[in-house]
A protein has these predicted regions:
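Active-site proximal helix-loop segment of RNase H-like, two-metal nucleases, encompassing DDE(D)
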Residues: 1-2, 97-107
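Short, cationic Gly/His-enriched loop motifs
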Residues: 5-95, 99-100
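Extended, polar beta-sheet/loop recognition surfaces of beta-rich domains
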Residues: 129-158
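A short, exposed loop/beta-hairpin motif centered on an aromatic-Gly-Thr core
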Residues: 11-16, 105-116
Length: 158
């Protein structure tokens, strides 16, 4: 399928039986879009924030979330090669670099001797960053999204 070649992260995704009837999805949409529409931000339907690794679109597993917040959870798997999330190897320095990208900016977090050390620095920084954004948006997002962000764990296998 051509769409899966362009966006392989959706390859194994499914839609719940209930939402295969568009009027059921439309009703859910209209009830939940109000939670987020009152804020002057672009928003997206997300399947991964409430349940990490989720592949099913359903009323229990997805939520509307501001686009900026959703961008915190992209993992760049197709672009990062053999290294964990937030890590690349600098051939000139011969070190592993911990790096976080957000809103088009790269934040260099340090150079390390091992992949694991670089990843741990990235993990610590990114989890704190997600918590900071959650706190800043606490009054703008549903509590279930806030709680998911406050409890988010980044793993070396992500």
């Amino acid at each position: 399928n051509a769409i899966h070649e362009l966006q392989p992260e959706y390859k194994d995704c499914t839609v719940c039986e209930e939402w295969l009837n568009y009027s059921n999805f439309k009703l859910w949409y209209e009830q939940h879009i109000v939670e987020i529409r009152i804020y002057d931000e672009a928003f997206e339907l997300d399947k991964d924030i409430l349940i990490k690794g989720n592949t099913v679109y359903s009323s229990e597993t997805v939520c509307f979330v501001p686009k900026m917040i959703n961008s915190l959870f992209t993992n760049g798997k197709k672009n990062r090669g053999d290294y964990p999330l937030g890590v690349y190897f600098d051939k000139d320095k011969k070190k592993y670099i911990a790096n976080m990208s957000f809103a088009g900016k790269n934040i260099k977090l340090g150079a390390y001797e091992t992949v694991e050390a670089a990843f741990l620095r990235y993990k610590e920084y990114k989890e704190d960053f997600i918590k900071d954004i959650a706190e800043q948006h606490k009054d703008k997002i549903p509590d279930k999204i806030y709680q998911a962000m406050m409890n988010w764990q980044i793993e070396i296998t992500d």
